[in-house]
Amino acid sequence: MDAFNKEQKDKLQLKAVYELKPGGELPDVVLAEQRTLAGLKRHGSLKPVAFADGDRLPQKFRDADLSWYGVFYDPIVFLVNQQYARTVGQANICSWQDLAGKEQLRIALENLSDSNSTQNFLAGLADRFGEDESLEYLGSINRFIGQYSKFPFTPVRMAAVGDADVAITRQSYVFKYLENKFPAYVVYPKEGTPVNLFCVGLFKNTADDLQGLKVMEWLMTSEQVQAIAQENATGYLFLFPRGFDEAAADAEKIWLNSSYLEPVKQDGLTNKWLSKVRFSK
């Protein structure tokens, strides 16, 4: 926000609102995770808007009814303990199938029923492979998981200190720790990976569509936004990683939760994971 406000030189100023209070005044622009935007759309809170920059996004990264547009994403990655990698070879820890094919492996993973983020991971796999195949895969690595973690940073700590060989986690959880002497490193699964997609949209009550669009376009196209994200070690990756004038990221390797955005559908999938994987006999 500070960067945008300095650039505007008092012509248009942004103020952050981090929580929507019942009966409170709605902001003009919303930047949030895809499930939040999908919920706002279901409740009729967003205003469809078409603009040229939005049309450049691959279709899977924008709402079919023009209610929201993707900006950046937080991918699921492997955090691999350095000592373990030296034992088995880095070339043997590159894919989802590499994990399932191991005879011995200690995996650290957050409980997949605890949060929107973990449920998106579960849903992203199911959207990519189908429910049966994704649950079968998670069942195949379940034997490597001693206990599902309650807190998101626990898997990171376990991989770093050697209590786990591999952590399956969000890049945003680990990026700030990645220094030369950090005892673990990040792997992007070569097949692709589930992500949390962060999107931008206009609230229905916005007083000025053009000013709102200016903010949306800045988020999507400004190289300064990417630079700020990198400087602050957010771990977020942008849909136009080499700049808005270059090609978009490979959509085939970015797995979205597209079919489980409604709570009842997500809860159904989560309950299947609980019964068929975590607490299976």
Give names to the regions the model predicted:
Residues 64-71, 80-82, 87-89, 102-129, ...:
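Short beta-strand->loop
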Residues 1-39, 43:
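Early extracytoplasmic/lumenal segment of secretory-pathway proteins
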Residues 56-60, 74, 107-113, 137-142, 148-149, 219-242, ...:
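Periplasmic-binding protein-like
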Residues 124-189:
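Ligand-binding pocket segment of bilobal, Venus flytrap-like solute-binding proteins
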Residues 79-84, 197-208, 227-228:
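A bilobed periplasmic-binding-protein/Venus flytrap-type ligand-binding module shared by bacterial periplasmic
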Residues 25-29, 47-78, 96-97, 108:
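A structural signal for short loop-to-beta-strand junctions that line the ligand-binding cleft
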Residues 40-49, 60-66, 176-188:
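Ligand-binding "clamshell"
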